[in-house]
């Protein structure tokens, strides 16, 4: 796949993401193009950094309408390289950092996609609960 994302798609993505919600800066993007074990590397001309699920939906809608592939990246901890773009728009969940709810009654934590496991563990511990997943 090439780094050919149309100027129209990029313009529309910038409009819905607003200031701070995107980057075309190679230095900002570079750490997201290499898998943590340095086995996989890739390219992207555009990094989308949505803060809300509404912004994610808007990015996906724009890209779907334009038939523009997207790679989603969370913590970049995958083991098979699926989080590394090969020319697609890269959508990072890193700014989606809210723990929305800790329900002691239901033993449920609702967290956005960019919340780290360490943060989920801390929220659970604060509620005198344990989140039984680790890496």
Q: What role is predicted for each listed range?
A:
Residues 1-35, 43, 65-68:
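N-terminal accessory segments
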Residues 13, 38-70, 89, 93-135:
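N-terminal glycine-rich flavin-associated loop
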């Amino acid at each position: 796949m090439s780094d050919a994302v149309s100027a129209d798609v990029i313009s529309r993505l910038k409009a819905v993401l607003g200031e701070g919600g995107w980057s075309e800066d190679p230095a900002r993007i570079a750490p997201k193009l290499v898998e943590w074990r340095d086995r996989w590397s890739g390219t992207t001309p555009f990094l989308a950094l949505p803060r809300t699920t509404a912004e994610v939906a808007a990015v996906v809608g724009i890209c779907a309408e334009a038939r523009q592939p997207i790679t989603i990246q969370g913590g970049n901890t995958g083991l098979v390289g699926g989080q590394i773009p090969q020319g697609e728009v890269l959508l990072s969940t890193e700014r989606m950092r809210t723990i929305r709810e800790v329900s002691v009654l239901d033993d449920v934590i609702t967290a956005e996609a960019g919340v780290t496991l360490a943060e989920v563990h801390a929220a659970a511990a604060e509620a005198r609960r344990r989140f039984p997943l680790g890496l």
